[in-house]
Amino acid sequence: IETLKPKACEIIWKPQIVKEFHTNGMMFQAFDKEENLLETWEVYSVGGGSIMEASESRIGRSEIYPLTKLEDIIKWCKDNCKELWEYVEEYEDKDIWAYLMKIWHSMEKTIDIGLSKTGVLPGTLKYPRKAQMFYKKARREGSRLKNTGLTFAYALAVSEENGGGGIVVTAPTCGACGVVPAVLRSIKEELSLDEEEILKGLAIGGLIGNLIKENASISGAEVGCQGEVGAACSMAAAIATYFYGGTLRQIEYAAEMALEHHLGMTCDPVGGYVQVPCIERNAVAAERALSAANYSLFTDGSHRVSFDEVVITMMETGKDLKCAYRETSEGGLAKNYKIRD
């Protein structure tokens, strides 16, 4: 409304209307002085900050990458003796590495800012920031608990910044923004990785997230939290497996496993805030990503269910979820948790 001033503007909410294209839709209508309709523009927020028009195709777009299935990408990598990050480099613009550097620096900055803050987050939940407490406790622990605690702390730091209106990287969404940065920071410190390696990992994680987005959805409003935290966990698991020296097949297995074991996860934010259960869920998912990576590394990478099959299953499962469990805050924890004074 402020943007369009001094032109008159009215916002009409119609939550009862659910469009087939996507649940998060907005229709702009322009009228002349006589209130005659001049033009209509229908757009949708499909997750991760992406906006699409109703006329665009949701599935199978190949604007940059020619292959839309991980199985086909792995075959390309084997045929060309390439890593997954090299597939990304092959088809992206030359400035991809500068862009990923910007992404990584933003992630690190958000972690540091989140770790520096205490107090409570905005909103009626009065949710306490815990990242700094976790960080301090983890620093005092032995090696086993230390690494776990630091991973928790980094995920909490980013997710708390999101819950407080801070700057985060959608990885793949705001609601799941803590998982990938936490895993990257944790492994960077564990293995003393340089930035060049970090960027390669980011490229792999981005590729996994893009495959999920293009073949299914990363929108909690469309498929529940399996499409947000589940996708983030899958991205982070692939990254971790690459850093730990995993093969192409082990990377695919870790990504598949991380998404598979989030199937059916609901999106039911209490009070409509991206705080409960979202913040804690990011921390747990970061550790689950590392567990998926470790599990895959104990195998030769062979398994029954493919990543591509799980992506399709996730989309179908999300469509079967009631609206109450897809970001509407009408069911689940949002319904049963009573906000306390």
Question: What positions do the PLM features span?
Answer:
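C-terminal regulatory domains involved in ligand/effector binding and gene-expression control
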Residues: 2-141, 150
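Short alpha-helical interface patches
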Residues: 55-61, 70-82, 89-92, 174, ...
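Gly/Ser-rich oxyanion-binding loop with an adjacent helix/lid
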Residues: 1-70, 158, 163-171, 176-208, ...
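Short, charged low-complexity intrinsically disordered segments located at boundaries
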Residues: 22-24, 133-142, 186-188, 213-217, ...
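Functionally critical mobile loop/hinge segments
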Residues: 240-341
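Generic secondary-structure transition motif, activating predominantly at the C-termini of alpha-helices
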Residues: 92, 108-115, 159, 163, ...
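Generic structural signal for well-ordered, non-membrane alpha-helical segments
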Residues: 21, 93-107, 144, 148-155, ...
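Accessory "access/gating" subregions that flank catalytic or transport cores
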Residues: 98, 105-224, 332-341
